[in-house]
Design a protein with these regions (language model features):
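Active-site phosphate-binding and catalytic loops of NTP-dependent enzymes
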Residues: 28-29, 212-215, 249-255
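Accessory interdomain/linker segments of ATP-dependent helicases and helicase-like nucleic-acid enzymes
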Residues: 223-286
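Hydrophobic helix-and-loop "lid/oligomerization" segment in the mid-to-C-terminal part
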Residues: 1-198, 270
Length: 286
């Protein structure tokens, strides 16, 4: 990821404007199947378009995404978009299935390590293209660094994610480099490969090393509030002012505002898996 500040922010901002001209029929069709109405923004790109493009390489071959982005034929673009949309649903289902498996294993084995590691069992490996997504979901839910490891043709491949401030995943891998074939990444995300013979030592050594590093850190997730905004001050002018700060992303996060002492009058769940909520606070919906 690159920080969305300075020149980078301006490039992305102009890029979004160009995207909204819909000069590429493939992107236009992909937006249709993603049910994007109106102009796209950085949220649509990150959570609706990009997952459908990336899924080609996660579950199959990236050629389908390449063809979608380069075709000038509307019928081909429509078919490729539909195919990628189906694969994206499959990706979501497989990701959730593996997350559920790992959470059940956590309960059964009563793991309480500072760094959690989950390894695929049996004869069916987990798709290498989605183990990073699984690690990210688990790390966010459990508030701990997580490694997800699956069988590969030549041993094992793994992916790690961490949101723990002060903990560096790539530094941890460097400390146990003798137990790995290859590795790479950065503080919050990593990927690695190792042989069958290396796996036991790797798991033992990295858990010990991580326990030492994490012993003095507060693993509880934190919500950092930028400012208090009384609910009566929320209006179109404020929304337009916040929009001028976009596009949001790395190093330029969307402002987190809080209104204290509010009474929830009504609540509705939204989304396929009820993963979103809609609240009514007094006469306001949020």
């Amino acid at each position: 990821c690159v920080p969305l500040i300075g020149e980078n922010r301006q490039l992305v901002r102009q890029g979004i404007k160009v995207m909204n001209e819909w000069q590429r029929v493939g992107l236009k069709e992909l937006a249709r199947v993603a049910q994007i109405n109106g102009e796209v923004n950085e949220w649509n790109i990150s959570w609706q378009l990009t997952p459908r493009i990336n899924v080609a390489g996660r579950l199959d071959h990236a050629n389908a995404a390449y063809r979608l982005l380069t075709t000038t034929d509307q019928a081909e673009a429509a078919q490729l978009s539909e195919d990628l949309n189906v694969k994206n649903v499959e990706r979501q289902q497989k990701t959730q299935s593996i997350v559920d498996y790992c959470l059940n294993e956590l309960l059964e084995l009563q793991q309480d390590d500072s760094l959690l590691a989950f390894v695929s069992r049996g004869n069916e490996p987990w798709p290498e293209g989605i183990i990073g997504l699984v690690a990210g979901r688990l790390s966010e839910k459990l508030a701990k660094p997580v490694l997800v490891i699956t069988k590969s043709d030549h041993g094992y491949k793994g992916s790690g994610r961490s949101n723990v401030e002060g903990f560096n995943l790539i530094s941890q891998l460097e400390e146990v480099a003798d137990d790995l074939e290859k590795y790479g990444g950065h503080a919050g995300a990593c990927g690695f490969s190792l042989t069958v013979q290396q796996l036991p030592n790797f798991l033992n050594n990295i858990k010990k090393s991580a326990a030492t590093k994490l012993s003095g850190l507060d693993l509880r997730p934190k919500l950092m509030i930028d400012a208090e905004l009384p609910i009566d001050n929320i209006d179109l002018e404020v929304a337009e002012w916040l929009e001028k700060l976009a596009p949001f992303g790395q190093a330029n996060p969307q402002p987190k505002l809080v209104a204290y002492r509010q009474t929830i009058r009504d609540i509705n769940t939204m989304g396929v898996n009820s993963q979103h909520i809609k609240l009514r606070l007094g006469s306001y919906w949020a």
